[in-house]
A protein has these predicted regions:
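DNA-contacting interfaces and partner/effector-binding or oligomerization modules
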Residues: 21-22, 30-34, 38-41
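Flexible, glycine/small-residue-enriched loop-and-beta-strand segment within the central core
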Residues: 36-128
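Detector for Asparagine
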Residues: 7, 25-27, 33, 71, ...
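Extended, small-residue-rich solenoid/repeat segments and analogous flexible loops
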Residues: 1-29
């Protein structure tokens, strides 16, 4: 079978992406150069892993939760990092339906410390802080 993987720039199952070289979002802060994403099956870290993070820089008028990633962090294929605060869903209102943009609440920054290992298809929720060497399966 000579056809490339559908919708994927990755040519082989063992390819990976050094995220410090590819991430452009000003709200993602990467410490060091050795954190990587096992990019098999999809279109890269920023597009497929980080969800609901605005690509405009945070300002005093419009603060945006930040994603901080340490050095030597390993991200497995198809893992997900949820961002975007409460995504307009307010459990303290009569309905969790996102009726109004004023219903947004920030969740706080998400921090993934040095040496963490995020397994394939694992999910990290917004506002979480993972300590050094944490493993998420």
């Amino acid at each position: 079978m000579d056809s490339p993987l559908i919708n994927s720039p990755v040519k082989h199952w063992c390819e990976f992406e050094f995220i410090s070289k590819t991430v452009k979002n000003p709200n993602i802060h990467i410490k060091g150069n050795y954190s990587y994403y096992s990019a098999y099956w999809d279109q890269g870290f920023e597009r497929c892993v980080v969800r609901y993070l605005h690509d405009k820089a945070s300002t005093a008028e419009k603060p945006i939760d930040q994603l901080h990633i340490g050095n030597f962090v390993c991200f497995g294929a198809e893992c997900v990092i949820m961002m975007g605060g409460n995504q307009l869903h307010r459990p303290d209102w009569i309905s969790t339906f996102p009726f109004d943009t004023r219903s947004f609440l920030p969740a706080g920054d998400t921090v993934i410390a040095d040496g963490c290992w995020i397994g394939s298809r694992a999910m990290i929720m917004q506002g979480v802080e993972l300590g050094e060497g944490a493993v998420v399966a």
